Structure formats: C-alpha cells, structure tokens
C-alpha cells in the first residue's frame, strides 16, 4: 500500500504538469513535445497506480495497461465512455513510443485536454475508492 501511495503522489504531480500545458490554446513545437512527454509519464504512472490498486484492494492481477483499464471499468472506477477513451489513450501512448511523426504529434496534442481530464478523473477515483 505504501508503494501505491508513493505512486499516487507522483501521478498527482505528473497529471498537474500535463494539465498545465494542456490548458493552453496553442503550443510552440517545444511545448507540444514537452506536453507529449508529460502525457507519456502521466499515463505510465497512472496505469501502474491502477494496477497496484487492483492488486491490493480487489485481488486482481492485471499485467497489461489495457487489462488494467478493462478491470477498472468492471469494478466501476471507469465508465464505459471513459474506458473507450482510456483504451484510445493507451493506443496513442504506444504510438508515441514507436513513432515520431509531426502529423501524429499535432493530432495527439489536440486530444491532450481530454486526456488530461480523464487522467485526473481516474486518479481521483482511485484515491476516493481507497480505504
């Protein structure tokens, strides 16, 4: 449980930094690239928080991000709509790892406000549901 609390604190800082950049109306290329890196880190730390939460409080062993997302829906942490967006976010995260394409970076940056809101909601729901 201590590991989960530490990860939640990291997730809080990461999501806050993502939200800070995502709230802008437009970005320089450097800001956009920084925002994508913040997204990558925020996503990674948050799905791992959710994985720890599932293991500790629900006795569910989910190894992959997509499985963690689906299990979060099954137990009520994410709605069907949030799950759909989280799965898309997971796919986008995978693409950022394997590809750098200017067009994709522009498309992804347009989704950052929504992704930031979803990550914030997911984080708060995990915190709220913790005993």
Where are these regions (language model features)?
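Solvent-exposed interaction patches of small proteins and small membrane subunits
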Residues: 1-131
């Amino acid at each position: 449980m201590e590991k989960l609390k530490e990860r939640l604190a990291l997730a809080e800082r990461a999501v806050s930094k993502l939200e800070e950049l995502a709230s802008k109306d437009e970005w320089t290329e450097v800001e956009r690239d920084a925002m994508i890196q913040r997204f990558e880190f925020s996503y990674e730390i948050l799905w791992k928080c959710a994985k720890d939460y599932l293991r500790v409080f629900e006795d569910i062993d989910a190894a992959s991000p997509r499985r963690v997302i689906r299990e979060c829906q099954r137990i009520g942490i994410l709605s069907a709509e949030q799950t759909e967006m989280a799965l898309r976010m997971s796919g986008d995260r995978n693409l950022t790892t394997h590809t750098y394409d200017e067009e994709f970076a522009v498309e992804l940056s347009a989704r950052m406000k929504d992704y930031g809101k979803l990550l914030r909601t997911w984080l708060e729901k995990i915190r709220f549901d913790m005993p």
